[in-house]
C-alpha cells in the first residue's frame, strides 16, 4: 500500500484508534475492567517478566487508555506516552523515574504553584533538591547545574505569568550536561507547538486542560521523544539490572522505549496514579476536536487582549502575542499560530482601593465567566492566583513567579466574543465606577468596601475612646481612705 503522512486534524481523530475487531465498533470502546485473561501459564509468566507486551492489570495498561496515549504521542511527534490520573501525577512519576535521594533538578521559577510545591516541598522531603531559576536565560540555568542534576524543567508558556521559554537554548544546556530537557506544554498543546521539534526530550501535559477541553475529566500524560541517550552514564537506574524484573535493564533491553517502560512498569506499578478507562474515553472526545477548539480559543483571546489593552481601567496585560512583550519575537518563532488563550492582567487601583481589592470586586461581579481553579475549559474562567493556586508560595516565590498581588488569570473560552467582553466590561464598571474610556459612570464597589471598613474602624475607635473615658471617670470617682480612717 502507498505510504502517506496524515495531517494533525486527521490524527487527532484517528491516531491510536482502530475498529474493534470483535464487534466492529468505530469509536474507541471503554474497556472497563480491572484485569485481563491470560492465554495460559506461560503467557502470564512472559507478561509479568516483560518478555512480551500485553495487558495484565489496568493499573499498568488498558486498551482505552492506550488509545489516548498513542493519539497524543502521535500529535506530539513522540515514540510513545504513559497516561496518568492527573497532570501532577505525570510530573511526579517523571521526577521519581529520573531522580533518587541526593539528586537535583533545575527548574524555572515561573511554574504553576502546585508544581513549585511538589518540587520545593514534597520532593525535597525525599532528598531531591530543586534550584529555581528566575527568567528564561539559558545561561542562568547552566550556572545552576550541579554534578547531581538530572533534568531541566520548564513550562513553555508560564502559568500564569505568560513568559515563553527559550526551548532551543535550554535544550543545548541540558544536552551539553547529558541530562534531558523536560517541558510542560499544557497551555500550548501540540496544536500550537511540538516541543520535541525544538529539542525537548520529555513532554508533560495536564490533559485535564485544553486537550480534554471541557472541564469534566482529570488526566495527565508523559510523552517521550526517543532521542535521549539514557546510557550516557548519568542515569544508573536506567542501565543497571532491575531486581524486581529478574535483572533486565531498561536501557539495555528496551532501548529508546526504556524510559517509557520504566514509567509504566515501575512508577505506575509502585505508585498507582493510573488513568481510568472512562476518563481516557472522555479525554479522547476532547482530543478529537482540539484543532477546531484551539482556533476558536485563539480568535477570542486575541480580541479580549486587544480590548483589555485599550481599557483605561486595566493596569497591564501579560500576553506574549503583544508586540511590546519581552518574549514577543520568541513567541512568534516558537508559536506562530499564537501563544494560547490563558494570560493575565491587572486592574488599576482606585483613589481608595488597592488593585487587589478592585480585582476581587471585579471577579465577584462577573456573570458569565466562572471563578474557579481550572484552565483550558470551553468556558471562560478567571482566578486570582495569589490567593488560590499560588497562595502557598512565599512573597519571594510569588515575585519570582511573576505573580503580583493584583494579577488576575483568565482562560478565554468559546462563548460569543461579544458576550465575553460584555461580561468583563460590566464587572469592571461595577468594581471601579468607570467605563471602558475611564469616565466616571457610577460608584465604585471597591471604594464602598474601603469606606465601609473605614466607617467600622472609626466606630470602633470611637467606642474604644468612649470606653476609655468612662473608665477614667470611674477611677476618679472612687472613694479614698484618709490617714485618720486608717
Question: Would you name each region that the model predicts?
Answer:
Residues 35, 40-92, 114-121:
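Conserved N-terminal alpha-helix of the aminotransferase class I/II PLP-enzyme fold
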Residues 2-4, 9-21, 81-311, 318, ...:
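Conserved PLP-enzyme active-site core in the AAT-like
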Residues 1-52, 436-486:
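N-terminal glycine-rich, Lys/His-bearing helix-loop that initiates the first secondary-structure elements
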Amino acid at each position: 500500500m502507498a505510504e502517506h503522512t496524515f495531517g494533525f486534524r486527521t490524527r487527532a481523530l484517528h491516531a491510536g484508534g482502530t475498529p474493534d475487531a470483535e464487534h466492529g465498533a468505530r469509536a474507541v470502546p471503554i474497556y472497563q475492567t480491572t484485569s485481563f485473561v491470560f492465554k495460559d501459564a506461560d503467557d502470564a509468566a512472559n507478561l509479568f517478566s516483560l518478555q512480551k507486551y500485553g495487558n495484565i492489570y489496568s493499573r499498568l495498561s488498558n486498551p482505552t487508555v492506550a488509545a489516548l496515549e498513542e493519539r497524543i504521542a502521535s500529535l506530539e511527534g513522540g515514540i510513545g506516552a504513559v497516561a496518568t490520573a492527573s497532570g501532577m501525577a505525570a510530573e511526579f512519576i517523571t521526577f521519581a523515574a529520573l531522580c533518587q535521594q541526593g539528586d537535583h533538578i533545575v527548574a524555572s521559577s515561573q511554574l504553576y504553584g502546585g508544581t513549585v510545591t511538589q518540587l520545593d516541598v514534597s520532593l525535597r522531603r525525599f532528598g531531591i533538591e530543586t534550584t529555581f531559576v528566575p527568567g528564561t536565560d539559558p545561561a542562568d540555568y547552566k550556572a545552576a547545574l550541579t554534578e547531581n542534576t538530572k533534568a531541566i524543567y520548564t513550562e513553555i508558556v508560564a502559568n500564569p505569568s505568560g513568559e515563553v521559554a527559550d526551548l532551543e537554548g535550554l535544550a543545548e544546556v541540558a544536552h551539553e550536561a547529558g541530562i534531558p530537557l523536560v517541558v510542560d506544554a499544557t497551555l500550548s498543546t501540540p496544536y500550537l507547538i511540538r516541543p520535541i521539534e525544538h529539542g525537548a526530550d520529555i513532554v508533560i501535559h495536564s490533559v485535564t486542560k485544553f486537550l480534554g477541553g471541557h472541564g469534566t475529566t482529570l488526566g495527565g500524560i508523559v510523552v517521550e521523544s526517543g532521542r535521549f541517550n539514557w546510557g550516557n552514564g548519568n542515569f544508573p537506574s536506567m542501565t543497571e539490572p532491575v531486581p524486581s524484573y529478574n535483572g533486565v535493564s531498561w536501557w539495555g533491553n528496551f532501548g529508546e522505549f526504556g524510559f517509557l517502560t520504566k514509567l509504566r512498569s515501575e512508577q505506575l506499578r509502585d505508585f498507582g496514579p493510573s488513568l481510568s478507562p472512562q476518563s481516557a474515553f472522555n479525554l479522547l472526545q476532547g482530543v478529537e476536536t482540539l484543532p477546531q477548539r484551539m482556533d476558536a480559543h485563539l480568535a477570542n483571546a486575541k480580541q479580549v487582549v486587544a480590548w483589555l489593552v485599550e481599557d483605561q481601567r486595566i493596569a497591564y496585560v501579560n500576553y506574549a502575542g503583544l508586540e511590546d512583550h519581552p518574549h514577543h519575537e520568541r513567541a512568534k518563532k516558537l508559536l506562530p499560530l499564537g501563544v494560547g488563550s490563558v494570560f493575565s492582567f491587572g486592574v488599576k487601583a482606585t483613589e481608595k482601593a488597592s488593585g487587589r481589592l478592585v480585582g476581587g470586586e471585579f471577579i465577584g461581579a462577573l456573570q458569565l465567566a466562572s471563578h474557579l481553579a481550572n484552565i483550558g475549559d470551553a468556558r471562560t474562567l478567571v482566578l486570582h492566583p495569589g490567593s488560590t493556586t499560588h497562595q502557598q508560595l512565599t512573597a519571594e516565590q510569588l515575585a519570582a513567579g511573576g505573580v503580583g498581588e493584583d494579577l488576575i488569570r483568565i482562560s478565554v473560552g468559546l462563548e460569543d466574543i461579544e458576550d465575553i467582553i460584555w461580561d468583563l466590561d460590566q464587572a469592571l464598571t461595577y468594581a471601579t465606577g468607570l467605563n471602558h474610556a475611564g469616565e466616571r459612570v457610577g460608584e465604585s464597589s471597591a471604594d464602598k468596601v474601603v469606606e465601609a471598613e473605614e466607617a467600622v474602624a472609626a466606630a470602633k475607635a470611637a467606642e474604644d475612646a468612649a470606653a476609655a473615658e468612662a473608665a477614667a471617670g470611674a477611677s476618679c470617682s472612687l472613694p479614698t481612705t484618709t490617714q485618720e480612717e486608717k
